[in-house]
């Protein structure tokens, strides 16, 4: 039986990473943003929300970027089925040699799989440069009911920000439109090999609303508006609407002196509806 394949004998993360990298014959790639989780306590920050999902009956998952399997193999002890999508084919091949039968390791692009996945649960210690794209892909995929994501701490702050806060952004609008987001934990750089230059945060997402095609236009307007987040919202939105070929709605002037960073996600949806006609 391969190491880590039983539900009772969990491998230490550092030992597992060492073995998988040895089997793959590779060193971490800066180009691919590879940082491997080697701290068992940090692995637990990801496992706790996965165990909660499993207890609620969500037992099939997609993992984006399993790397050396630090989260994959422990997660297989609580989930019935995992499809793990790894971009690096050497890592995918090495991990597949150690993974239990309930884990299917495939080579591919994680963002594309996130958008098309049939699994109700997605988890990922995300490559930092892909975090926003992964979140957007998950938002659009209404089959995804929940997600557990490791992201750069600053991105986590934006994902969980509320209107009026310093970190509020287009990403905040996107997440809030369809998910309930919570900061579940923080992972220090020392938990990774090699060490990243930033803190990692574990964010949980729970779907609270289905994605609507209307939201794409709402996010387009939000993206335009947040390029001038400290300006008066009515003036900025008027320019954004005109650039999109839409007539500003009569209620736009009622925003008064409100700034862009004070607008609610629902305000952008209302603008998108007005733009639609």
UniProtKB/Swiss-Prot annotation:
Task performed by this protein: Specifically dimethylates two adjacent adenosines in the loop of a conserved hairpin near the 3'-end of 16S rRNA in the 30S particle. May play a critical role in biogenesis of 30S subunits.
List keywords of the entry alphabetically: Cytoplasm, Methyltransferase, RNA-binding, rRNA processing, S-adenosyl-L-methionine, Transferase
- Gene symbol of the encoding locus: rsmA
Q: What is this protein called?
A: Probable ribosomal RNA small subunit methyltransferase A
Q: What is its main location?
A: cytoplasm
Q: Where in the cell is it found?
A: Cytoplasm
Q: Which InterPro entries match?
A: KsgA/Erm, rRNA_Ade_methylase_Trfase_N, rRNA_adenine_dimethylase, SAM-dependent_MTases_sf
Gene3D superfamilies attached here? Vaccinia Virus protein VP39 (3.40.50.150)
Can you name a GO cellular component term?
A: cytoplasm
Query: What does the record give as EC number?
Result: 2.1.1.-
Q: Does the keyword Methyltransferase apply?
A: yes
| SMART domains reported in the protein's UniProt record | rADc
Q: Name one GO molecular function term.
A: rRNA (adenine-N6,N6-)-dimethyltransferase activity
- SUPFAM superfamilies named among the record's database cross-references: S-adenosyl-L-methionine-dependent methyltransferases (SSF53335)
Superkingdom, taxonomy of origin = Archaea
At which positions is S-adenosyl-L-methionine bound?
35, 37, 65, 86, 109, 125
Q: Which family, according to the similarity comment?
A: Belongs to the class I-like SAM-binding methyltransferase superfamily. rRNA adenine N(6)-methyltransferase family. RsmA subfamily.
């Amino acid at each position: 039986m391969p190491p880590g394949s039983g539900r009772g004998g969990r491998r230490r993360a550092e030992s597992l990473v060492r073995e998988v990298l040895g089997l793959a014959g590779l060193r971490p790639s800066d180009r691919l943003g590879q940082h491997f989780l080697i701290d068992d306590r940090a692995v637990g920050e990801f496992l706790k929300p996965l165990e909660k999902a499993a207890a609620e009956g969500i037992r099939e998952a997609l993992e984006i970027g399993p790397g050396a399997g630090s989260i994959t193999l422990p997660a297989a002890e609580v989930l019935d089925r995992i499809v793990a999508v790894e971009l690096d084919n050497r890592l995918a091949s090495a991990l597949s040699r150690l993974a239990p039968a309930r884990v299917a390791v495939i080579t591919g692009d994680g963002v594309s799989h996130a958008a098309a996945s049939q699994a109700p649960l997605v988890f990922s210690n995300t490559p930092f440069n892909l975090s926003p794209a992964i979140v957007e892909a998950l938002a659009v995929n209404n089959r995804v009911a929940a997600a557990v994501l490791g992201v750069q701490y600053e991105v986590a702050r934006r994902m969980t920000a509320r209107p009026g806060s310093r970190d509020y952004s287009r990403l905040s609008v996107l997440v809030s439109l369809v998910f309930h987001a919570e900061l579940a934990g923080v992972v220090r750089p020392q938990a990774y090999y090699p060490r990243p230059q930033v803190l990692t945060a574990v964010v949980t997402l729970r779907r609270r609303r289905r994605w609507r095609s209307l939201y794409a236009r709402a996010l387009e307007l939000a993206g335009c508006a947040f390029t001038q987040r400290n300006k008066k919202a009515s003036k900025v939105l008027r320019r954004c609407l005109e650039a999109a070929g839409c007539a500003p709605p009569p209620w736009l002037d009622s925003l008064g002196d409100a700034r862009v960073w004070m607008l609610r996600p629902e305000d952008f949806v209302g603008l998108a509806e007005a733009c639609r006609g």
